[in-house]
Amino acid sequence: MGTRAQQIPLLEGETDNYDGVTVTMVEPMDSEVFTESLRASLSHWREEGKKGIWIKLPLGLANLVEAAVSEGFRYHHAEPEYLMLVSWISETPDTIPANASHVVGAGALVINKNTKEVLVVQERSGFFKDKNVWKLPTGVINEGEDIWTGVAREVEEETGIIADFVEVLAFRQSHKAILKKKTDMFFLCVLSPRSYDITEQKSEILQAKWMPIQEYVDQPWNKKNEMFKFMANICQKKCEEEYLGFAIVPTTTSSGKESFIYCNADHAKRLKVSRDQASASL
């Protein structure tokens, strides 16, 4: 019995800083063979004091899901090309982090300062379909995408307008908003247009136009829905130059990765000046 256990090949995995192991399955494997290797590997990892065991299964190895679940694994998250399962094998409390809990969205207040008009759209589908509501261009920030670049991308995709990010004006948090489970973080941003001729994204946008800010604010929908009323008020104050938002300050993490801090626009300017002066003195 012991000799047979020694002959069973263990699954190869990459250890992490939290006494965990991630197994990335690549080669096709019979589910019974996989079960034997998994059992032997789990026994080995317990002896080593490992805690969280992750198994990454590509679409082509979906036949191994049932076997993994039978050995105590549970779903953690899925992407288009793989499923991630996890099992906590330690006697200590389970500290496996939850799956991603938030989706980040952004709305764009694009201001034409010459005419005091803002860019608005009517959508072909979704919540606002057939409601005759003119709304700001909005969209979801992609994985690995910064808020300030994502909101500009959405504006160009929906309207053809090229615009530069200026500030984050406000943000709101809404629970159970995505798939009745995930939390939606929505950032209201102001952008400055570099072009003014509109080309609607026919697949999503019914029509788009430049609208006087007061007309946007006075829409019945904005009047009767408090959250939209507050957002519209912030937009109006920004158009009247009576509101200061959060600008970006480029920086780097301790590992050298590029990152951005969002802070009061006035203070952001001071931080940039201070950094430039320090760089000039080197």
Swiss-Prot record:
Enzyme Commission number(s): 3.6.1.-, 3.6.1.13, 3.6.1.22
Main location class: nucleus
Keywords, in A-Z order: Cell membrane, Cytoplasm, Hydrolase, Magnesium, Membrane, Metal-binding, NAD, Nucleus
Record-listed Mg(2+) binding positions: E154, E158
Entry keyword Metal-binding: yes
Motif Nudix box mapped to chain: 139-160
pH dependence: Optimum pH is 8.5.
UniProt KW Membrane keyword: yes
Gene ablation phenotype (knockout): Growth retardation, constitutive pathogen resistance phenotype and increased levels of reactive oxygen species and NADH.
Conditions for induction: Rapid and transient induction by biotic and abiotic stresses. Not induced by H(2)O(2).
Regulation: Not inhibited by fluoride.
Cell location: Nucleus; Cytoplasm; Cell membrane
Temperature dependence: Optimum temperature is 50 degrees Celsius.
Top-rank taxon: Eukaryota
Required co-factors: Mg(2+)
GO CC annotations, alphabetized: cytoplasm; nucleus; plasma membrane
Nudix hydrolase domain mapped to chain residues: 101-233
Subunit structure: Homodimer. Interacts with RACK1A, GG1 and GG2.
Family to which this protein belongs: Belongs to the Nudix hydrolase family.
Protein name: Nudix hydrolase 7
Source organism per UniProt: Arabidopsis thaliana (Mouse-ear cress)
Gene symbol of the encoding locus: NUDT7
